Amino acid sequence: MCIRDRAGGVIEAAVEAMRAKVPDCKLKAWLGPRIGFDDFEVGSEVAEVFRTKYPDVAGGIKAKDAKYCVDLAAYAKAALNKVGVEDIEDCGLSTFADAERFYSYRRDGEQTGRHAAVIWIEQ
């Protein structure tokens, strides 16, 4: 999922689509590996998108040199909370910082691989 998708509301839209199909569903979210807060550097325009979309997130952006670092986990949690998902677990792993286990386009450039996710329904 790209950063503009996350800021653009794809998390909220996905939850709303699930609830449209199963209105009484109890959702649990798991935040998987992603680029860590200290390593996700963006320009002011991207930082401002997050500030505007989620003004209640405290500490989700910090200045670093001439750039800004964005805490993707904090904003994903805010997006989930916005649509009523409160049961959220976060693995806390950074794809950028953990080169032994994860690919990172930002770290490795063109030498990339793939990540996978599992989603299921329990009845």
Show which residues each predicted segment covers:
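Active-site microenvironment for binding and transforming phosphate-containing groups
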Residues: I3-Q123
